[in-house]
């Protein structure tokens, strides 16, 4: 089975803590699936506004790399030699997400765990019993998990007014008079009898 070298996933910020009654269940299922397919994983909850964008949008980014990649091999070797220290440095400085979105500090509390310590027969058992608390950043290498809360190196957000164009509006943004009937029909209410390929009729609205 051919697998991609790199996987980038994006989801809502609450993914790491969902669902409320089984905190972390959904995210731990994702980690388990990627681990079983031979991937190392790093994740971060990122607010676009913290890095200068004119939008307050928090999203969870999951970056996975397969065990055939150079970055996987380098991290695996570092973890073997330095243990948690290298995992912490990966989250804070060396990771793909840390390089793209720098952080300035971290919480004192952290989570260390092994995904293999969670014993279950299959994914359905995880869905019923899994409950784990993880922070807004972390890394998993060969089933070993390290997670910590990080504070971003904030860049002053760009006000929306600075992004709006104030000059003349190009003509191609306006509807032409001759196109109005087609737009009126497309956007307006309708109830038309149409025919399927098998000859039966249906009402299109």
Please give the residue ranges for each predicted region:
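Class I S-adenosyl-L-methionine
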Residues: 1-204
